[in-house]
């Protein structure tokens, strides 16, 4: 089994059931935080040999021992090592994707979970410069009952192995 197949298999497990609705928050601007599904994080951590930093965390959902919260301002910090990024999906997402790309140029390996918004400027300016793995189906973020109303992708910036 190839590593990319493992990602696709995860996507199959998270497929949305026909007729399921979405929580109202998914269609509102009530939040731009989408908590990473633990199983997806665990699989990515295994593929990349563990992550050393989560720069877009809350104390409650941090995925790494070293993490930055909103108060720490992850955009203003240096990212080193193997970094996992699931940024807020609001208006600042272009800043996070640019930061991920720029930190990879300084030596970090940055693995991002992003909405697959291929029609956006930030996707064309930065996301497409990484290796892109589109996830099959739609993810269930955090404790949501239903799948997200958008597809997702893993974007990898930096020196890494090819799968």
Write out the residue ranges for each language-model feature:
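Class I S-adenosyl-L-methionine-dependent methyltransferase catalytic core
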Residues: 2-163
């Amino acid at each position: 089994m190839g590593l990319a197949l493992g990602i696709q298999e995860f996507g199959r497990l998270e497929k949305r059931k026909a007729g399921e609705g979405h929580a109202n928050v998914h269609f509102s601007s009530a939040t731009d935080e989408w908590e990473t599904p633990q199983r997806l994080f665990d699989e990515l951590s295994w593929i990349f040999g563990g992550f050393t930093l989560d720069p877009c965390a809350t104390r409650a959902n941090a995925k790494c021992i070293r993490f930055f919260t909103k108060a720490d301002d992850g955009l203003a910090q240096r990212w080193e090592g193997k970094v996992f990024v699931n940024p807020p999906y609001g208006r600042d997402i272009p800043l996070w994707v640019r930061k991920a790309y720029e930190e990879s140029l300084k030596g970090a390996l940055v693995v991002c979970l992003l909405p697959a918004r291929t029609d956006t400027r930030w996707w064309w300016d930065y996301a497409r410069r990484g290796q892109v793995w589109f996830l099959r189906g739609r993810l269930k973020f955090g404790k949501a009952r239903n799948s997200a109303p958008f597809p997702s992708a893993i974007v990898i910036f930096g020196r890494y192995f090819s799968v």
